[in-house]
Amino acid sequence: MMEENRAEQLFFLWEKISEGEIRLLRVFGEQPVVTVPGFIDGRCVRELGDYCFSRRKLPENEIRYSRYCGGMWESGLFVSKDKVKNNCIASEQGNAAENIVSLEAIEQDEKLRELSEKYIKEVQLPADIVKIGSCAFYNCTKMERISVYPKLVEVGSDAFMNCLNLRSLQMCAGVEEPTGLKQLLAQIKWQVEVSFEQEDGEREAVLLYPEYYESYDEIGPAHIFELNLTGEGFRARQCFKDGVILLNAYDEIFPQACVEESAEVLIPMAWNRLYTACGLPPEARAAYETYVREQSGKVLTILLKKRELKPLHFFFEKGYGRKEQIEDAVAIASHEEWMEGVASLIAWKRQLFAEQTETADVRSRYAFEEF
């Protein structure tokens, strides 16, 4: 689990939940992307504490630290200030068995940054975490992606408050497994893409959850308020049963979403379901395909910007794109100096549109002979 962090130094502050389990309180590192280890100091990481990735006051309980650097671990007692550290050392009466580190000492290390708020960008949580505390990622305005496992079932209030750049949520689970995704989505009202990925990185399903808005209307002089919900994102977030996502219910939202949502929302909704078509019934497939064909120009533009060959080939192979569009794509890829894309597109044109080309050549020959 720590292979991703091997080249850097990491500091973890934590407290005991039990003898074998801990709650993570703070993380310091050299990079804005971090993989939280499954075990620290021989104890299983079970929870993210309140305000874990936010610059807030630490709890008053006994706090321990663990330092990871170059594949080696060091652990000991954490104190808030050097003065407290000196008092602790004095009280040990020369017993140097316990390492003691202060917050001031950590902050003096020029390589280390507190992974919080405007610095943290991506977090990979370990498999055994069951809880994210309240406001754990409060004000992490630069965070773009978080990866979690199915054991995570409890998410505290406002866990992702002001994390408006968080647009990607990776579930390291199968789409038919019970997970805590519903609890996570309840804390993310803005648009977010969720991918269900296996250990080999294969995406089993990718779902887009649109943004939704809440407003209240006052009814009469009794000060009774009626909740109004705008956007299909709320309904999409309710498509679960016993922690398992109901794909059919999610697909049934699309026709109404076509009325309320913009193309920027509908295109990834439709494309993701077609490209990772896990549990996709024929009627839903037909609705998604109709929309993708209607928006084929915009879809192609998005795919070309990503420079990914597999989805681009899928687009033309399934007949969502026309012959003139693949010719336009060749011109665009050439202009952008994407030579791999140019070569692939030319090959696909010959392979997928050969019959059209031959028919056109025959017609041209007959027309020339008649002339």
Predicted regions and their residues:
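Structural signature of tandem-repeat unit edges
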Residues: 2-3, 9-21, 28-46, 58-131, ...
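Extracellular beta-strand-rich solenoid/capping regions of secreted or surface-exposed proteins
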Residues: 48-50
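Repeat-mediated protein-protein interaction surfaces in helical alpha-solenoids
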Residues: 271-288, 310-312
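Ankyrin repeat arrays, specifically the small/polar loop and inter-repeat linker segments at the C-terminal end
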Residues: 287-295, 320-327, 340, 350-363
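Ankyrin-repeat helical register
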Residues: 302-303, 329, 333
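Ankyrin repeat structural motif
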Residues: 308-316, 338-347, 354
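Extended, charge-rich intrinsically disordered regulatory tails
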Residues: 323, 366-371
